């Protein structure tokens, strides 16, 4: 199932630990504090447990959304890059 993990974590070290966990589970960074990818239900639970351990003792808001393939394929994406220099 397609998953989206988003988070708001003020502590730099805890935030990096969450990013590392998402990467360890094969998710791709789609924004600074957002990762997406395909995870089984078992891996969803395991990742969320790992994230919970990594943010222990820190302020954190972490959300994991699960989408069926139809909903995921219907999403709209706008990505632009400019040379803002």
From Swiss-Prot:
Residues given in the record as Mg(2+) binding sites: 8
Cofactor(s) required for function per UniProt: Mg(2+)
Keyword Hydrolase among record annotations: yes
Alphabetized UniProt keyword annotations: Antiviral defense, Endonuclease, Hydrolase, Magnesium, Metal-binding, Nuclease
Record InterPro entries: CRISPR_associated_Cas2, Virulence_VapD/CRISPR_Cas2
Source domain of life: Bacteria
Entry's EC annotation: 3.1.-.-
Subunit: Homodimer, forms a heterotetramer with a Cas1 homodimer.
Name recorded for this polypeptide: CRISPR-associated endoribonuclease Cas2 2
């Amino acid at each position: 199932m397609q998953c989206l993990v988003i988070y708001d974590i003020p502590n730099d070290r805890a935030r990096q630990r969450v990013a590392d966990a998402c990467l360890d589970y094969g998710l791709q960074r789609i924004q600074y504090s957002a990762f997406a990818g395909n995870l089984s239900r078992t891996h969803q639970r395991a990742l969320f447990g790992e994230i919970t351990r990594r943010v222990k003792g820190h302020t954190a808001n972490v959300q994991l959304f699960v989408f069926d393939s139809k909903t995921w394929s219907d999403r709209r994406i706008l990505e632009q890059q400019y040379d803002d220099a």
